[in-house]
C-alpha cells in the first residue's frame, strides 16, 4: 500500500486483512506457485507499507520456498526490519544494486508513479534472472482518472493493450494479463464521475467500521 495511505490503518495486521489487499495476496501466491522452485529470492519495488512482505513472511502458504526478500522504496525512512520481520531473511533499502538478480519481482501499484515507465520496466527486466517472473499491478482505464490519482502521485492509468505493449517494448514476455476487481467497475465509474473528490483526501483504502 502507498505510504500516503498509511494513516488509514492502525496496524499492519489490520491492513493485511482489508479485502482489497487480501485479494492481491492471491496473485502473489499464484506467481510463487507458478515459479515452482525453492530458495526463491524476491524483490519488491515500491514496497510502501510492506503489507506484501508481511504476507510473504507470515501468511503465505509458500513462505518455506522463499530464501530472501528485499523491499525497495525511495520513500522509506526507517530501513530497520519491523518486529514481524526480525527473524527473517528480509532487508529494506531505498535502492537496489544494479548487479543483484531476483527470481521474482513484485511491482504492485508502482509503475503509475513513474513518469518514465518504460525505463523502469527495462530496469526491472535487467534485475530478473533469465527465468525470472515479474508481477505488476496498475490502476486501469484513463477515463477513471480522478483526484485520488493526483493525491497518490500517479502519472497515468493503463489498459491491457497499453501495458502489454509497454512490457513487450521493454523486452518482457507477457505470460498473463487481465483486469482485477472488474466486478466493481460500474460502481467505481459512477463514483468517479458523479461525486466530487477533494485532492487532499487521504485515499480510497480505509479500514472497515
Please report, for each region that a protein language model flagged, where it lies by residue:
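Conserved N-terminal segment of class I S-adenosyl-L-methionine
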Residues: 1-100, 104, 108, 118-121
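A C-terminal cap/extension of S-adenosyl-L-methionine-dependent methyltransferases
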Residues: 3-4, 13-17, 92, 184-209
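Short, glycine-/aromatic-enriched active-site segment of Class I SAM-dependent methyltransferases
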Residues: 11-12, 135-156, 162-165
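Short conserved AdoMet
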Residues: 37, 115, 129
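A short His-aromatic
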Residues: 109-113
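A short glycine-rich, Lys/Arg-flanked "PGG" loop and its adjoining helix->strand segment in the class I
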Residues: 118-133
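Conserved S-adenosyl-L-methionine
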Residues: 172-182
Amino acid at each position: 500500500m502507498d505510504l500516503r495511505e498509511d494513516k488509514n490503518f492502525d496496524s499492519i495486521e489490520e491492513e493485511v486483512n482489508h479485502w482489497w489487499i487480501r485479494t492481491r495476496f492471491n496473485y502473489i501466491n499464484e506467481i510463487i506457485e507458478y515459479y515452482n522452485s525453492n530458495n526463491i529470492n524476491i524483490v519488491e519495488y515500491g514496497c510502501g507499507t510492506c503489507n506484501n512482505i508481511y504476507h510473504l513472511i507470515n501468511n503465505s502458504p509458500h513462505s518455506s520456498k522463499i530464501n530472501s526478500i528485499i523491499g525497495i522504496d525511495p520513500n522509506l525512512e526507517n530501513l530497520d526490519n519491523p518486529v514481524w520481520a526480525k527473524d527473517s531473511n528480509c532487508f529494506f533499502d531505498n535502492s537496489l544494486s544494479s548487479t543483484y538478480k531476483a527470481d521474482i519481482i513484485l511491482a504492485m501499484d508502482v509503475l503509475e508513479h513513474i513518469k518514465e515507465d518504460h525505463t523502469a520496466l527495462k530496469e526491472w527486466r535487467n534485475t530478473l534472472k533469465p527465468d525470472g517472473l515479474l508481477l505488476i499491478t496498475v490502476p486501469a482505464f484513463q477515463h477513471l482518472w480522478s483526484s485520488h490519482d493526483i493525491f497518490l502521485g500517479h502519472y497515468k492509468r493503463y489498459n491491457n493493450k497499453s501495458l502489454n505493449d509497454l512490457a513487450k517494448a521493454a523486452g518482457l514476455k507477457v505470460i498473463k494479463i487481465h483486469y482485477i476487481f472488474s466486478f466493481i467497475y460500474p460502481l467505481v465509474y459512477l463514483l468517479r464521475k458523479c461525486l466530487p473528490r477533494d485532492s487532499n483526501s487521504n485515499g480510497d483504502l480505509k479500514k472497515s467500521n
